């Protein structure tokens, strides 16, 4: 399965966010989307998830322009969860309304334990969860339905070291059957986890293969590109 961006454009008023960008994202790979604040990473995710219409070009999934019937997993930077429910209640409800998309559902407690939520917190209100715990629950919903495309907006940044390590293992385990794209400001995370880094800069997408990650001046060259100081960079 492939997610293809073909001459995709998006702007708000006179500000161009995506300028006829082209890129192909393939199943079985993890992509890191890097860019400065305000570069348009969230806008790109919203276009892919069809929360926003593009102004030009097209986005296709598995050669289909209309893929609204395909589940797109989207983990937002700010969790969007019902604060009045407990973690257990929410996951139970989520499983019930997505029953036709889940092949072998587990007990909600099993899922919560999987992502490192302590048993004592399973029946606590979500509003009392830390930001990191809420992010775990939000990511869990995408793992339960196993969507073919998973968009992660600044994942792992609110997790502690142990939780981040566990989430990395989970992402690697679902990688063969998933197109995973995550935005991040943490270069070391992208280098550690990704098969390819995609830079979003001045409305354009630029791909960097994993083979370049270990270059001794990789980080320096990347910063130069994003700060418009690069001249003849080989990245």
Feature map (PLM): residue ranges:
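The feature captures the beta-strand-to-loop junction immediately N-terminal to the Walker
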Residues: 31-36
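Conserved beta-strand-loop-alpha-helix hinge in the C-terminal portion
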Residues: 204-227
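Helix-to-loop junction immediately C-terminal to a conserved catalytic motif
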Residues: 49
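Conserved ABC transporter NBD signature motif
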Residues: 54-70, 207-209
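Conserved structural motif at the start of ABC-family nucleotide-binding domains
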Residues: 3-5, 18-20
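Helical segment within the ABC ATPase nucleotide-binding domain
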Residues: 164-176
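Catalytic Walker B motif of ABC-type/P-loop ATPase nucleotide-binding domains
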Residues: 150-154, 159
